[in-house]
Amino acid sequence: MQALTHPSYAHEHPPAEHNETLAFLGDAVLGLVVADLLVRGTPGAGPGSLTIRRAELVSTRGLASWARELGVDACLRLGRGEAQGGGREKESVLASALEAVLAALYLDGGLAPVVSVVRQLMEPQGEPAEA
């Protein structure tokens, strides 16, 4: 549940823990996995084009889209004010929650399950997803 708990909820419901630290870890894990899948899936691509594509995929907008696709928005625990302010639709909230979920997946199962999820998310966008 921590991965889906926004800081506003944790503030209103102590001792609930929020997802910010998990999002920090998830950002790093996601960057590694996306970079690896891009390098393996596009042999001969230069670092410039790989960097641009990775940045597009892991942008706040891109992550929010993936979060919606996975239904993360429906599972978020938000404080009253954040919920009333449209927190479930905020790209930054969704992106952070997805990063936190991926970090929790990594902590529980290592890189393999994260690679599996990210590969599935990348494929509909026409990305090469090897590994």
Locate each region found by the language model.
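Double-stranded RNA-binding/processing signature
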Residues: 1-131
